[in-house]
A protein has these predicted regions:
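Signature for HUH/AEP ssDNA processing cores
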Residues: 1-132, 143, 198-202, 206, ...
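A short acidic, often aromatic-flanked loop/helix-cap motif at beta-alpha or helix-coil junctions
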Residues: 23-24, 135, 187-188
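Catalytic core of tubulin tyrosine ligase-like
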Residues: 138
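DNA replication initiation modules
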Residues: 142-221
């Protein structure tokens, strides 16, 4: 995991340490066994030790993740050498945003984008900690860069860290949010790239948004 985190940082992508899944053991209190919460399912316990964690293995370790996240390869290497089991968190809204849709909708949208000549950037498949369906993550050019501070705008699609748990439809990860990066594991298997990052500039989010929104709408029919 360390070498991959270093590669992300070397590409200029902000990274920070993420929680990981670990084997759950029985937990007891003086009143007997603790109630089993969502984060206590066998094989899906979060390393944060938060009872009923809504996103086991899929959030930063530190509450100060927005301050600590960075793209220094040396620092990233040191972090993961010290905590080799940590998942990789990519912070959005600085270098890139992420359009996050159900995997089936993402596949349908991809099939339509190519004939239409719409260029996509990196696309990842991310299993969800507490949901049966995977999510497709489309990496796009950010609209929340600091250079655009005076013109930054929000919309109802914006996704924030509190928006944990299974959510249908389209989510837009921008400033103040994050995603779990391949090959981190936060569900039944590890996240993976469908289309790996390359040298080409990231696409404009609005070019992809129509296709993704239509695919999500059709999936609800």
């Amino acid at each position: 995991m360390a070498s991959i985190a270093v590669d992300y940082a070397a590409a200029g992508w902000p990274v920070c340490l993420g929680t990981h899944l670990r084997e759950e053991r029985a937990r007891h209190s003086r009143h007997g066994a603790l109630p089993r919460g969502r984060g206590l399912d066998p094989g899906r316990a979060c390393s944060s030790d938060r009872i009923g964690c809504p996103a086991p293995g899929a959030h930063p370790i530190s509450p100060a993740w927005q301050i600590e996240a960075g793209s220094d390869p040396g620092e990233a290497g040191r972090w993961w050498r010290e905590q080799p089991e940590a998942n990789i968190i990519l912070v959005t809204g600085r270098v890139f945003d992420v359009l996050d849709v159900p995997a089936a909708a993402g596949s349908a949208a991809l099939a339509r984008m190519e004939p239409a000549g719409v260029r996509t950037g990196p696309v990842a498949l991310s299993p969800q900690p507490l949901a049966a369906d995977d999510r497709a993550l489309f990496f796009v050019a950010t609209r929340g860069a600091l250079a655009d501070e005076d013109e930054w705008w929000s919309c109802h699609l914006d996704c924030e860290p509190d928006d944990f748990g299974p959510v249908a439809g389209l989510r837009w990860h921008t400033r103040g949010s994050f995603v779990v990066a391949p090959p981190s594991r936060s569900g039944r298997r590890a996240a993976q790239w469908i289309r790996e990052p390359g040298e080409q500039p990231l696409p404009d989010a609005l070019r992809l948004l129509e296709f993704l929104a239509d695919a999500c709408e059709e999936a609800r029919v």
